[in-house]
Design a protein with these regions (language model features):
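Catalytic phosphate/metal-binding cores of nucleic-acid and nucleotide-processing enzymes, i.e., regions
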Residues: 1-160
Length: 160
């Protein structure tokens, strides 16, 4: 298992008039409404941003991934709105760098999105990758997902 810290936004250009960087927020709303060239710049920059974190990672044949969103503020949001774009960009980069043969369902049969909390100092999406060909990692994944579900139900009962 390894973990990647993915930024919630990437720099896609520079505004000369305002003398500041142009940022692209990695979420589905922006993805849907943005010009394709800007999207391509965002995807390229994302790959560059995570490349250093992938050094030393073993090549995999099959894996499962957990995307945990840590927001920088208390505003409510849709987890899938943020995590889906991180999933798209990360899995494409993971395949392009040669760590996985393909990102189809036979190589990544399960993906889990979850909320990690508020992190004002370090908003991010943590991506955990578990090798399905390693029994120890499969057990860790099972334990982690069981703990996540147990925590959800305990909180739900407490609120009733």
């Amino acid at each position: 298992m390894f973990k990647i810290n993915s930024p919630l936004k990437v720099i896609v250009g520079f505004n000369k008039k305002k003398q500041k960087n142009v940022e692209f927020l990695l979420n589905l709303n922006n993805f849907r409404n943005t010009f394709y060239r800007v999207l391509n710049n965002a995807k390229v920059q994302y790959k560059i941003d995570i490349q250093g974190q992938l050094e030393g990672v073993e090549k995999l044949k099959r894996c499962v991934m957990i995307y945990t969103v840590f927001k920088g503020d208390n505003r409510r949001f849709d987890i899938g709105n943020i995590a889906s774009i991180h999933q798209k960009f990360f899995e494409d980069a993971f395949v392009e760098y040669g760590y996985l043969p393909d990102d189809k369902y036979t190589n990544i049969p399960m993906v889990l999105y979850r909320f990690g909390g508020i992190s004002k100092d370090n908003p991010r999406v943590e991506i955990e990758v578990f090798n399905l060909d390693d029994e120890y990692e499969v057990k860790r994944f099972k334990d982690l997902t069981k703990d996540t579900i147990d925590t959800f139900y305990k909180e739900r009962k407490r609120k009733k």
